[in-house]
Regions:
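Extreme N-terminal, non-catalytic leader segments
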Residues: 1-9
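Hydrophobic anchor at the beta1->P-loop junction of P-loop NTPases
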Residues: 11-13
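Small-molecule kinase domains that catalyze NTP-dependent phosphoryl transfer to phosphate-bearing small molecules
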Residues: 100-101, 109, 127-128, 139, ...
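ATP-dependent NMP and nucleoside kinases share a basic, alpha-helical "lid"
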Residues: 99-107, 112-145
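P-loop (Walker A) phosphate-binding loop of NTP-binding proteins
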Residues: 16, 28
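Walker A/P-loop
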Residues: 22
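ATP-binding Walker
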Residues: 19
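ATP-dependent small-molecule kinase phosphotransfer cores
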Residues: 40-109
Length: 173
């Protein structure tokens, strides 16, 4: 088979918030393996993509804005206390991130690539990958990491964790 038509091995890297996905990604990057960070691309869409921002305003209202930008603490509070709102934002973002990943993948020339995403299964993209790596950490450790990293309260972090797929469900897939 010609080198041009060979697809890289697509590896999904997942785990709950604060599990250590970014640390593992850095190891892969240090080995020269390209990493697509889904969370970074989602945030970029919410900060820079006017079309996405308009969709968010339409779904969540003008009150979600602060100084012409999305008020992320307010958005987080809304989506992690209302499962319907969480589904709404995922319905907006997941297809856009999937398209960005597809475009990025076409440009890769390595034998392996990593797609880092806390929501591989929720976004229905896990089945498009060849292998999955699940990064795990004790819940208490995860909570402490996120409190320090994101300046969130324990209650906020627990709400996020409770809205993510359980590790047991990933292992049983």
């Amino acid at each position: 088979m010609s080198e041009i038509f060979k697809q890289p091995l697509k590896i999904g890297l997942t785990g709950g918030i604060g599990a250590g996905k970014t640390t593992v990604s850095k190891i892969f990057k240090s080995l020269g393996i390209p990493v697509f960070n889904s969370d970074d691309h989602s945030k970029n869409l919410l900060v820079k993509n006017k079309g996405t921002i308009k969709e968010i305003i339409k779904e969540f209202g003008e009150a979600i804005m602060k100084d012409e930008s999305i008020n992320f603490p307010k958005l987080s509070q809304i989506i992690f206390t209302d499962k319907k709102k969480l589904k709404s934002i995922n319905k907006i973002l997941h297809p856009k991130v999937a398209l960005l990943f597809s475009e990025w993948l076409k440009k890769q020339k390595c034998k392996y690539i990593i797609k880092e995403s806390a929501l591989l299964f929720e976004s229905n993209t896990a089945s498009l990958l060849d292998k999955i790596i699940l990064v795990q950490a004790v819940k208490k450790t995860r909570i402490q990491r996120v409190i320090q990293r994101d300046n969130r309260t324990q209650k906020e972090v627990e709400r996020i964790i409770n809205n993510q797929i359980k590790e047991k469900e990933i292992i049983n897939c």
